């Protein structure tokens, strides 16, 4: 995820971040990054409350977002059907179980050490029944990409790869 975060930033994305200010959750996005497409991290380093708020923003569930934050987000967009607020939602193993995501059109599996059952769980987060009902019928699809690494013969025979 760290490398993909850098790739996104190099391609004009900004991280969707929150902070608590005076007891209220507020956006923590630099002024120069406002208006850029954003990505969010769901890694286990965030508090449970913060992760839940970010997930609700991604899902467009405004009724579960604190009012101060909701007002700020609605200045960006009134929904997140097409990624208007958060376009990319990156999850580590901490996000593989127990959450539902809405309107997710693409799943990219980039961590090589996941067990096949875990991969199916991750895909299942994006393919829940009725999770795409707010989208037009032709957009109610989920494409899954599994990235694999392949070593060359030279790399396999070299002692440098041990």
Where on the chain are the PLM-derived regions?
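Conserved helicase ATPase core of P-loop NTP-dependent helicases/translocases
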Residues: 21-93
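Short glycine-/polar-rich loops that comprise or flank the Walker A/P-loop
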Residues: 34-38, 102-106, 134-144
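Conserved strand-helix element at the start of the C-terminal RecA-like helicase core
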Residues: 1-6
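Flexible phosphate/Mg2+-sensing switch loops adjacent to catalytic phosphate-binding sites
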Residues: 15-25, 133-137
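Conserved nucleotide-binding/hydrolysis micro-motifs of P-loop NTPases
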Residues: 46-48, 95-97, 113-115, 148-154
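Conserved helix-turn-beta segment of the N-terminal RecA-like "Helicase ATP-binding" lobe
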Residues: 7-15
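A conserved SF2-helicase RecA2
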Residues: 117-123, 127-162
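Conserved RecA-like helicase motor core of SF1/SF2 enzymes
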Residues: 93-133
């Amino acid at each position: 995820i760290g490398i993909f975060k850098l790739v996104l930033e190099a391609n004009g994305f900004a991280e969707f971040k929150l902070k608590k200010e005076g007891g209220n959750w507020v956006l923590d996005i630099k002024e120069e990054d406002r208006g850029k497409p954003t990505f969010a991290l769901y890694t286990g380093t965030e508090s449970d409350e913060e992760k839940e708020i970010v997930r609700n923003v991604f899902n467009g569930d405004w009724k579960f977002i604190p009012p101060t934050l909701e007002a700020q987000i609605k200045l960006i967009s009134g929904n997140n059907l097409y990624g208007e607020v958060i376009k990319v939602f990156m999850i580590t193993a901490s996000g593989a179980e127990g959450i539902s995501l809405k309107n997710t059109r693409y799943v990219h599996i980039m961590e090589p050490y996941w067990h096949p059952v875990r991969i199916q769980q991750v895909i299942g987060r994006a393919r829940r029944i009725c999770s795409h009902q707010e989208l037009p019928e032709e957009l109610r699809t989920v494409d899954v990409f599994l990235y694999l690494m392949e070593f060359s013969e030279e790399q396999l025979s070299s002692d440098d790869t041990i």
